Amino acid sequence: MTKGKIITLEGPDGAGKTSVLEQLVLKLEKDNEQSIVTTREPGGVAISESIRNIILDVNNTEMDFKTELLLYIAARRQHLVEKVLPSLSAGKLVFIDRFIDSSVAYQGEGRGLNKSDIEWLNDFATDGIKPDLTLLFDVPSEIGIARINQNVNREINRLDLEKLEMHQKVRQGYLELAKANPDRIVLIDASKPLDDVVDEAYRVIKERFAH
């Protein structure tokens, strides 16, 4: 049986990774090399989707930063056990829209929480499981925010309402993660047209997992 793998898509808000994932999977499915599962964080399974609704509710303005982090971690654990691990055991290629790096970038760099604590919580929730590959879609914060504001189909969530400074910190957190994990994280310029970004992501995956 083909070994299951985890590929995560990361990036600041407005990077377009969700749109990239849709097109990327279509290209990979045409190759018919491995069964593909796509999922997201927070969410992916019923319990985690319920937690997602709490986290992103625009009315929950009083949410403490540590509460926010712990909710993400709880959603991550349930999602991993209920969906990701069974998919890996079945030899599938699992694409996750956000995973452990989001917590470091958003709650660590963005919120200013202790990154060592976050890394410990990530390891606790995942039993130390890391992605086989992370595609980091990078875009300047101003462009990302402009994209969010222009997307009439996007449902605005609590994190979208943060000021520019928060988005800039998150981006910086991601760039630092890329420097610290060059073997796992591949940086992709997401300011380019969607088709170009999809092609680049496809190329990276094919090169990384060439038989």
UniProtKB/Swiss-Prot annotation:
It catalyses: dTMP + ATP = dTDP + ADP. Keywords: ATP-binding, Kinase, Nucleotide biosynthesis, Nucleotide-binding, Transferase. Phosphorylation of dTMP to form dTDP in both de novo and salvage pathways of dTTP synthesis. SUPFAM superfamilies: P-loop containing nucleoside triphosphate hydrolases. It comes from Streptococcus uberis (strain ATCC BAA-854 / 0140J). The gene is tmk. The keyword Cell membrane does not apply. ATP binds at residues 11-18. Pfam families: Thymidylate_kin. This is Thymidylate kinase. NCBIfam families: DTMP_kinase.
